[in-house]
């Protein structure tokens, strides 16, 4: 078992946040088949593209135990990753939903998905303290992901969390501003940073984030990794 896998096992046993522990225990009483634990990261450990989300959805990855699995956000994300050649889900399944459960055979190619918070929070809003408790896991994870070239931050919390890591390790975050499609690339940065709206239903069902907009994000990521894109 390598260090990255060991870290994920450690994450699933975490009980640092009493509010979240109690919240998940209450959900588990009602839905006994739900995962209801911290959700580990998912993907290719040699990936060049790191995707950062916010937190598990109550009825998505909190239910299934795998990042972006079992809800509308996952359907939107994995459909786009398939179109980008970054996951193996066959087109004929129709992506309804794209990712059903942790044992459905889905595999990621050259991308790795993590999140700034590992437990489903009430109202999908982790507190600053809860984000801080998870941050050490993110720091360790990035250290172990040796091949990352491009970071795709899904939402402002993911974007700000990555900037916090930069401030600790590289530079001050002066000049960084979250906006969909913003790209930060510099010889002083360890990775190319691409900002995107989160594929939440609040964004996708209102048209704030369209499939075309999301495809453009991963088209850019592919271009920075390979020099070209098939999207």
Language model features with spans:
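A polyanion-binding, active-site-adjacent surface
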Residues: 2-182, 186-227
């Amino acid at each position: 078992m390598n260090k990255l896998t060991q870290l994920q096992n450690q994450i699933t046993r975490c009980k640092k946040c009493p509010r979240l522990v109690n919240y998940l225990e209450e959900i588990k009483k009602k839905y006994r088949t739900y995962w209801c634990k911290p959700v580990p990261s998912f993907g290719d450990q040699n990936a060049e593209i790191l995707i950062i989300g916010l937190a598990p959805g109550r009825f998505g990855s909190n239910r299934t135990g795998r990042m972006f699995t079992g809800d509308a956000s996952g359907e939107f994300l994995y459909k786009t990753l398939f179109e980008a050649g970054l996951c193996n889900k066959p087109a004929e399944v129709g992506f309804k939903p794209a990712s059903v459960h942790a044992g459905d055979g889905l595999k990621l190619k050259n991308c790795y998905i993590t999140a700034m918070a590992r437990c489903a929070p009430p109202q999908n809003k982790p507190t600053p303290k809860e984000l801080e408790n998870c941050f050490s896991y993110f720091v360790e994870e990035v250290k172990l992901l040796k091949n990352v070239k491009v970071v795709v931050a899904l939402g402002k919390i993911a974007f700000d969390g990555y900037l916090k890591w930069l401030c600790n390790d590289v530079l001050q975050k002066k000049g960084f501003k979250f906006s969909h499609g913003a790209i930060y690339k510099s010889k002083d940065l360890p990775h190319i940073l691409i900002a995107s709206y989160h594929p939440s239903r609040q964004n996708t069902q209102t048209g704030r984030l369209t499939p075309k907009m999301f495809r453009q994000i991963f088209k850019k990521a592919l271009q920075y990794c390979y020099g070209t894109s098939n999207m």
